[in-house]
From Swiss-Prot:
PROSITE patterns: AA_TRNA_LIGASE_I. This is Isoleucine--tRNA ligase. Monomer. GO terms for cellular component: cytoplasm. The gene is ileS. InterPro entries: aa-tRNA-synth_I_CS (IPR001412), aa-tRNA-synth_Ia (IPR002300), Anticodon_Ile_ABEc (IPR033709), Ile-tRNA-ligase (IPR002301), Ile-tRNA-ligase_type2 (IPR023586), M/V/L/I-tRNA-synth_anticd-bd (IPR013155), Rossmann-like_a/b/a_fold (IPR014729), tRNAsynth_Ia_anticodon-bd (IPR009080). It comes from the Archaea. Pfam families: Anticodon_1, DUF5915, tRNA-synt_1. It comes from Picrophilus torridus (strain ATCC 700027 / DSM 9790 / JCM 10055 / NBRC 100828 / KAW 2/3). It is an enzyme of class 6 (ligase). The lineage of its organism: Archaea, Methanobacteriati, Thermoplasmatota, Thermoplasmata, Thermoplasmatales. Belongs to the class-I aminoacyl-tRNA synthetase family. IleS type 2 subfamily. The keyword Magnesium does not apply.
Length: 1024
């Protein structure tokens, strides 16, 4: 009995079963821990996990980010790196968590929370953030995401928040954290301000009023300024009209009224008018006008025209209505003239009792306000328009721009530093650096940090009644200034800590705010390691080498990490960042629970398995959106994973028969071996280059091409070497090439398909406990033969053209044909032609010249393209073309252009029709210029040979079904019509040799299997 050196496998084993088997293997053998130990103290590579919140289920988009992260880390392990900071992370604070809690309790506003109790509310928030942590951990295991979950950083922990306190104290002491009363984006539903990067994530394209309003000039009857606004609800708070000092304005008369507006807008608003005078905007400055609505007080210095450069000619009339209570630019004008701010809107976004529309939400009052303007002859024109407007990115409420006391981080002061540090970052894709991300940095706004909410990192600022402020940077600082350290630093416990003012000795109470949760995640670079309190933080840990998340994090985590690191360390937070786009449903729609198209990560993995899912994520660039495509995922499995299972099975079955065991790669002598090893090593170079540059999708494409060439070219053309004869030197070199190529391919795939690669690696009698402990393949340069690769590429194209042409002619591959003609500019060496000849399966294969091609070619000019060049000579050219069609064709094919009496015409100016002559079918490859012609005539001799080949194929299938070893002899019984009998008799020896049949008998046996061969029924039985 021969020893089984390589385990025979079930090639139909499901990918799910493979995943589960390998997951158990890793756990039982502590592979993850062993990799960490074996790579300790090697070249450091720091990773930082973008922290999700575990109060929601992981979806298929999360799988993609985890696939990218894990692929990069596995690759770095295999290329000799010690991965630092490979811990998970959990984002625990903020509005998303609070809104879920409010929904659970049925709360409508902040008053409900305070009546319920901050302590109980926050306790629910704390408990809820880990609601789905078990599912997250299961998904991470199933997808193969190797991170240290036990030591994950968690933003709600005291150590983490203490590091943030240190950072905020540092910013405060450097005058970068300041309190100011100014206009901020404000969510009336959540009752808190938002930062500019949060606002950027919530824009919607909506229909809003477009209103042209008449403001009466003071002391001048029937003279008005026409101002434009999309927020009529702000008109009761109007205090100024703003013009651009350098633009041209006109005073015109129409229908007995006079109007001021931008000169360039007159024609669009008036059909019939008389120009009175033109002005520069600065000439209008200081003109007073009547208060538009007499419901609010009349502040001193208000109701006048002022000039400012922010006014543009793009929309409206060039005259902007300014309400300092509701716009940042307006607010600055109000400050310039020291006016009292008119704010009739409460923090729920409703008008107060000073206006007739008391109790209405501001935008709900728009129609009533427009009606008021119409009734009082103050409305010039009212329309609607579509434009982008910000909504709360968490609850979906329309944001207001509202005046509040807010703590700001002065990001605007470090814009130059942000841009300089951005230059140090490798962005993938690179256009984000100076595009979406760089543009955002150029306009970086001061960060509205404080939130008038409950569940978050408390702002570490205390204030006494004399308005002295104190920033706390650690728990010890609480003791230093006369307080105590609560067990939990969250609200409400921290609110009870009273300190002693170091300036005046009076009591200090904490500013009641929490901070923007984006500061939490943006602090992960240092706070995850409890810097500066922990001594574990080193230069190797910062900046981190690699991060990746979805594209929207250019306005989120990527941005806040960058800002915080630039503020605190004058450094970029990360060196390499891969931005990932979204996974869409099968119809290209964004997935959500409300639409019913949400795909849970665990369901996706249970349907397809981790390796097929991971390969699917890399079918295109990760930064391009992709739709879930069941057919594509099935093709990925069949073309790559199933193919490799079959390649391994072929190797193992034959190697076990021949008792072959791989020891080392042998120098290739056979042309196919040389080509296969050249392709392998060329691929290794390309794959490493792309993996090093985070282009995983491109690396995978090269691997997929190699798998196809290994199976469909090398094995297909080499089968007989494995089936025939004893284990001689040539056969041993074939085994060596096949084993080595298969093993190195599996190792290349390992970071992308970790389970599948481990499965096949273990079957190949490995040298390491895990494929992931192997070194990543390195190219053996001496095996690379570029000329041979180029020639074989053309040979493969010829085989593909033959396959396509046969398909179109309905001639099977096993049916020999009379003649194949090939036209190609590249001459193939004879030994390559000999190799591909059996695949072409023709009695005669001839390489021909262009004028020998059985084609009728007509070339005609595309008049739309040549007329301008030929002009009056176009008739002469058409006559020339008619007489010299073949010559023109050859010139265009060889040179890409022709010269007609000094006029150069290129091949894209012509239309070429090719009609095949006689009994030929043909195909061509546009890229290489190869033409292939097949003679479609099949005479009786060819037909019989084709039948014989079909019989051989059926017997081989039956041998495989019986699990016969390749050396086992059989006896074959056949029953068929005269044509098939004639074919068997003529090719008896060939059939015997190729099927290992010791005897072939014509006999009708009731146990015979029926086969269909070209509409003929053939009965075959084989016995050992």
């Amino acid at each position: 009995m021969k020893a089984t050196l390589y385990e025979n496998i079930n090639v139909n084993k499901s990918m799910i079963d493979i995943n589960n088997e390998i997951l158990n293997y890793w756990k039982e053998n502590h592979i993850d821990e062993n990799i960490i130990k074996s790579n300790r103290n090697l070249k450091p590579f720091a990773f930082l996990e973008g922290p999700p919140t575990a109060n929601g289920r992981p979806h298929v988009g999360h799988l993609m980010t985890r696939a990218v992260k894990d692929t990069v880390m596995r690759y770095k392990y295999m290329t000799g790196h010690d991965i630092l900071r490979r811990t998970g992370g959990w984002d625990c604070h903020g509005l998303p968590v609070e809104l879920e809690a409010e929904k659970h309790f049925g709360f409508k506003n902040k008053k409900d929370i305070e009546n319920f109790g901050i302590e109980k509310f926050n306790q629910y928030c704390r408990d809820s953030v880990f609601r789905y942590i078990d599912e997250w951990n299961i998904v991470d295991d199933l997808v193969g995401f190797w991170v240290d979950k036990e030591n994950s950083y968690i933003t709600l922990k005291n150590d983490y928040m203490e590091s943030e306190w240190w950072a905020l104290k540092t910013l405060y002491e450097n005058n970068l954290l300041v309190k100011d009363y100014k206009i901020v984006p404000y969510c009336p539903r959540c009752g808190t301000s938002l930062s500019s990067h949060e606002v950027a994530q919530g824009y919607k394209n909506v229909d809003d009023p477009s209103v042209f309003v008449k403001f009466a000039e003071k002391g001048r009857k029937n003279r008005y300024f026409i101002a434009w606004t999309t927020t009529p609800w702000t008109l009761p708070s109007n205090e100024f009209l703003v013009v651009n000092p350098d633009m041209d304005y006109s005073l015109i008369e129409s229908d007995g009224f006079e109007y001021y507006l931008l000169s360039s807008k007159v024609e669009s608003l008036f059909n019939d008018y008389k120009l009175i005078k033109t002005f520069k905007g600065r000439d209008l400055e200081g003109i007073e006008y009547e208060q538009l609505m007499p419901f609010l007080e009349k502040p001193e210095n208000a109701f006048r025209v002022v000039a400012a450069s922010f006014v543009t000619a793009e929309d409206g009339t060039g005259i902007v209505h300014a309400a300092p209570a509701f716009g940042a630019d307006d607010f600055e004008i109000g400050k310039r003239f020291s006016v009292e701010i008119l704010n009739p809107v409460d923090q729920d976004g409703r008008f107060n009792e000073k206006l007739p529309w008391s109790g209405l939400f501001v935008t709900d009052a728009n129609k009533s306000i427009i009606n008021y303007l119409k009734e009082n002859n103050l409305l010039f024109k009212a329309e609607t328009m579509k434009h982008d407007y910000p909504f709360c990115y968490r609850c979906g409420t329309r944001l207001l721009y509202y005046p509040l006391d807010t703590w700001f981080i002065k990001v605007s002061l470090i814009r130059k530093k942000l841009l300089e540090n951005n230059e140090k970052i490798n962005w993938v894709p690179d256009y984000l650096k100076n595009g979406r991300f760089g543009n955002f940095l150029e306009e970086a706004k001061d960060w509205a940090l404080s939130r008038d909410r409950y569940w978050g990192t408390p702002l570490p600022i205390w204030r006494c009644n004399k308005n002295h402020y104190l920033a706390i940077g650690s728990r010890d600082d609480l003791l230093k200034y006369g307080g105590y350290i609560p067990e939990d630093l969250h609200r409400p416990y921290i609110d009870d800590v009273v300190l002693k003012c170091p300036e005046c000795g009076s009591e200090m109470h904490r500013e009641s705010y929490v901070i923007d949760t984006w500061f939490d995640s943006g602090s992960a670079s240092y706070a995850a390691m409890h810097y500066p309190f922990s001594k574990d933080f080193t230069k190797s840990h910062f900046p981190v080498d690699f991060i990746t998340e979805a594209i929207d994090q250019t306005r989120g985590w990527f941005y806040t990490l960058h800002v915080v690191a630039s503020l605190l360390f004058d450094e970029n937070a990360y060196k390499n960042v891969v931005s990932i786009s979204h996974i869409l449903d099968e119809n290209g729609q964004k997935m959500s629970k409300s639409k019913g198209n949400f795909i849970a990560a665990i369901d996706f993995l249970n349907d397809y398995g981790a390796d097929a899912a991971r390969m699917f994520f890399f079918t295109g660039a990760p930064w391009n959106s992709k739709s879930v495509n069941k057919k594509l995922i099935g093709e990925i499995t069949r073309k790559n994973l199933s193919t490799l299972l079959n390649v391994y099975s072929f190797f193992a079955s034959n190697a076990n028969i021949d008792e072959y065991r791989f020891t080392e790669i042998k120098e290739p002598e056979n042309l196919l071996d040389r080509w296969m090893l050249s392709r392998l090593n060329t691929t290794i170079i390309k794959v490493r280059e792309n993996m090093d540059n985070y282009n995983i999708h491109t690396a995978l494409r090269y691997i997929e091409d190699l798998i196809s060439e290994l199976s469909n070219v090398y094995l297909r053309l080499s089968r007989k070497r494995f089936w025939e004869g004893n284990l001689d030197d040539s056969k041993e070199r074939a085994y060596s090439t096949l084993y080595y190529t298969l093993r190195e391919t599996i190792k290349m795939m390992a970071p992308i398909t970790p389970f599948f690669s481990e499965y096949l690696y273990q079957k190949l009698s490995p040298g390491m406990p895990s494929v992931h402990m192997e070194s990543y393949p390195e190219a053996i340069e001496r095996f690379i033969d570029n000329d041979l690769e180029n020639e074989m590429e053309h040979a493969i194209e010829i085989m593909e053209l033959s396959r396509r042409t046969r398909q179109e002619l309905n001639i099977k591959g096993r049916q020999p044909v009379k003649e194949i003609l090939i036209y190609s500019d590249i001459k193939l060496r004879d030994d390559i032609i000999d190799i591909i000849s059996p695949e072409l399966n023709a009695e005669s294969i001839r390489f021909i010249k262009s004028d020998e091609m059985p084609l009728k070619i007509t070339v005609r000019a595309d008049i739309s393209k040549v007329a301008k060049l030929l002009k009056s000579r176009i008739n002469d050219f058409n006559l020339y073309l008619e007489r010299n069609n073949d010559l023109v064709y050859r010139e265009l094919k060889s040179k890409g252009k022709i010269n007609f009496d000094g006029i150069y015409l290129t091949d894209d100016m012509f239309i070429m029709n090719e009609e095949v002559n006689g009994n030929y079918g043909f195909n061509k490859d546009e890229r290489s210029g190869i033409y292939l012609f097949i003679n479609r005539e099949i005479d009786n001799d060819l037909l019989l040979e084709g039948y014989a080949r079909e019989i051989i194929r059926r017997i081989q299938v039956m041998r495989k079904d019986l699990n016969l070893e390749y050396s086992e002899k059989i006896k074959t019984y056949i029953d068929a019509d005269e044509d098939i009998r004639s074919a068997v008799e003529r090719y008896m020896e060939k059939i015997k040799n190729e099927t290992l049949s010791s005897e072939i008998l014509f006999k009708n046996d009731p146990e015979a299997r029926a086969w269909d061969i070209d509409d003929k029924t053939v009965y075959i039985k084989i016995v050992k």
